[in-house]
Amino acid sequence: MRCPYCQSEDTQVKDSRPAEDGAVIRRRRVCSVCGGRFTTFERVQLRDLMVVKKSGRRVPFDRDKLTRSIEVALRKRDVDNDRVERAISGIVRQLESSGEAEVTSDEIGRLAMDALKGIDDIAYIRFASVYRNFSKAVDFHNVIDELTVAETEDDLDA
């Protein structure tokens, strides 16, 4: 593994342990040249997914882009990073295990919204405003109403 600080390929693994309920291996590494320390994650990738954009263009699935989108929605929210990482891994597992080589950007957005709904209401609303392309204040009210109805139904089921 190349050092992110000095680009040397002489790095050593100092610690390995399972993460995300065993779905990932977390490795602490140290560079033999500059002494820099960094963490890497090893995940299983079942297949190369292609994302079909709304324009019809096809691009390779990018887990980092999904992560950034969810992190933007969660900015300044007090949410445990492990919980977020588990949600992202869950989305990726769903996509990879679907058996399809292509997935639409809408499907990825829907899965991200479902995950955020279970994590943080404010992040859910933020993500929905971009994903659903809100243009009026009433769009926000509608999503808040959806959340309120869902919470009321959950309270009745409990």
UniProtKB/Swiss-Prot annotation:
Residues 11-20 have a biased composition (Basic and acidic residues). One of its GO terms (molecular function) is ATP binding. It comes from the Bacteria. Residues 49-139 form the ATP-cone domain. Residues 1-20 are annotated as: Disordered. PROSITE patterns: ATP_CONE (PS51161). The keyword Isomerase does not apply. It holds the Pfam family Zn_ribbon_NrdR. A zinc finger (unnamed) spans 3-34. One of its GO terms (biological process) is negative regulation of DNA-templated transcription. Its cofactor is Zn(2+). Binds 1 zinc ion. InterPro entries: ATP-cone_dom, NrdR-like_N, RNR_NrdR-like. Keywords: ATP-binding, DNA-binding, Metal-binding, Nucleotide-binding, Repressor, Transcription, Transcription regulation, Zinc, Zinc-finger. Negatively regulates transcription of bacterial ribonucleotide reductase nrd genes and operons by binding to NrdR-boxes. HAMAP family: NrdR. Belongs to the NrdR family. This is Transcriptional repressor NrdR. The lineage of its organism: Bacteria, Pseudomonadati, Pseudomonadota, Alphaproteobacteria, Hyphomicrobiales.
